[in-house]
Amino acid sequence: MENNIENFDPSLVYFGDRGQDFKKMIRSILSLGMSDEYIPYLTTPESLNTYNTAFTSRGADDKNNYEMFEQLGDVSVNKFIVNYMYKRFPQLRNPNGVDVVAKLKIKYASKNQLQMLSESLDMWRFITATYDERTNKKKPLLEDTFESFFGATEWLIDSFIEDIALKQGNNNTYVGVGYNIINGILTTLFDRINISLKYENLVDAKTRFNEVIAEQKSIIGDVKYEDEYKNGKHTSKIYRYPPNSNLKELLGIGTGTLKRDAQEQAASRALETLALKHNIIKEAPDRFKAFM
């Protein structure tokens, strides 16, 4: 057994389930924004073959993988998020709200957010990828597959509508029908999310930490990140070097499978330390206060 573990090849491929459960998963997602009578058109063997590609990483298959659909889906998902935020929060429909919507887009189109949505839709067990990818790149895989699913769905619908038009002798193109469907699915998903317009919820901890350092540098002094990677885990420590002192103070420690996640956690704890021990608090910028 030990020899098997030692000789295990992480480049080997995990093949996601492509049986009835895969079809049920596709149907369940489509039903969030599509009438049941039309779903069978997207669960034909040909369509499921497209979804198979949309759930396959490049590491698993360098020729038939989700990269094209992920690129298409990335554009559509980002467009949806901006439009959705203006519809959900009409008070942001003005020049002062543009920056807030930009922050909303960064947060809700982020790897963390999209991978959580992907997991909530039970996509993980259906993703075909190398064992190395599934072990060390879970978040990127989930994010890419989420975007790829919507890119593939939009592509399938537009292609289906175009084929019907051509058979009827209509050479017009009907771009946008597919987006309308995925817009409905995404709206259902995002309506379930409790979205806050508070500055501390919109702007990541590392950015807020950097801002407070810039504003209070004369009091806080210099700051340094010390990062370490060991046994598949990143550890980040943040130290401050107070002015006119030879001492250094540990402000926060963070860990994560990704370096930026470790730094984000460390920055969050550093903000807490500055507030609790030194009464240094990062105030929300005026452009955010109007919407909080």
Curated annotation (Swiss-Prot):
Q: Report the SUPFAM superfamilies cross-referenced here.
A: dsRNA-binding domain-like (SSF54768), RNase III domain-like (SSF69065)
What reactions does this protein catalyze? Endonucleolytic cleavage to 5'-phosphomonoester
Q: Which PROSITE patterns match?
A: DS_RBD (PS50137), RNASE_3_2 (PS50142)
- N-terminal signal peptide: none
Does the record bear Magnesium in its keywords? no
Q: Which UniProt keywords apply?
A: Endonuclease, Hydrolase, Nuclease, RNA-binding
One GO BP on record is:
RNA processing
- Designated name of the protein: Putative ribonuclease 3
